[in-house]
Amino acid sequence: ELEDLCDLSVRSLEELIDYQDYPVRAAEIATLGRRSLGVGFIGLAHYLAKNGHKYDSQGAWDAVHKLTESFQYYLLRSSNQLAREKGPCADFGSTKYSDGILPIDTYKSDVDEITQERLTHDWDTLRTDIKEFGLRHSTLSAQMPSESSSVVSNATNGIEPPRGYLSIKKSKKGP
């Protein structure tokens, strides 16, 4: 399911970049050159609870490792597929990805001290494909606070744990 959601997110936001009216020429140039996206997730606490993990447990840390690896992998693979279909973003050559550097190469190695989970996706093939075809987007993921979108979705904020057993949230646009 995550694979399909990541692909749908990348392809939908790709269409919005081209559909968007840009009131400032500089914004249009920057956006079309880099085609940056900011796909993140909300409801991590719910995901962990639903899968039987306390937020600060070893099981949770292992589950988050698996989730975030898959999330990054599927986003990159979708962008790589779009690059095959439409070409890479104009500024691809100025990204770390053009040098074959992937998130698995730059993550904070302290993570290895809290989880022994190993990588499960075929990163070597993806690296080769990215070097050959590029990426359609220079940035794909972002972990935003997501306060207002979590209200609309009736979910917990992004990656944050709940603040208490009961939370009452209101958006500026109403309950």
Cite the ranges covered by each PLM segment.
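Long, C-terminal-biased catalytic regions of enzyme "large/alpha" subunits
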Residues: 1-175
